[in-house]
């Protein structure tokens, strides 16, 4: 009985409807493939961004060291003009 029901449904579907259903399935398949491609691209981008962030974090300690150096130099220049600051040769003789 089930087979006769599907045969009856097939007879009720016109050729135009069959063509529409086939084309709809093709378009849905293309959309699915495109979405998968986009998802793969986004995953690759995510991996690249995570790698870049990891490299940046590796330089954080170096950045902190340079910041400390520049902050120290800035505090020295605020205390005395450059002409009055001792040079290495002057500090060795003291």
UniProtKB/Swiss-Prot annotation:
Name the record gives this protein: DASH complex subunit DAD1
Primary subcellular site in the record, as a coarse category: nucleus
Known role: Component of the DASH complex that connects microtubules with kinetochores and couples microtubule depolymerisation to chromosome movement; it is involved in retrieving kinetochores to the spindle poles before their re-orientation on the spindle in early mitosis and allows microtubule depolymerization to pull chromosomes apart and resist detachment during anaphase.
KW Phosphoprotein (keyword) present: yes
Gene that encodes the chain: DAD1
Additional record remark: Present with 799 molecules/cell in log phase SD medium.
Family statement drawn from the similarity comment of this UniProt entry: Belongs to the DASH complex DAD1 family.
Subunit structure: Component of the DASH complex consisting of ASK1, DAD1, DAD2, DAD3, DAD4, DAM1, DUO1, HSK3, SPC19 and SPC34, with a stoichiometry of one copy of each subunit per complex. Multiple DASH complexes oligomerize to form a ring that encircles spindle microtubules and organizes the rod-like NDC80 complexes of the outer kinetochore. DASH complex oligomerization strengthens microtubule attachments. On cytoplasmic microtubules, DASH complexes appear to form patches instead of rings.
PANTHER family assigned: DASH COMPLEX SUBUNIT DAD1
Residue numbers bearing the Phosphoserine modification: 91
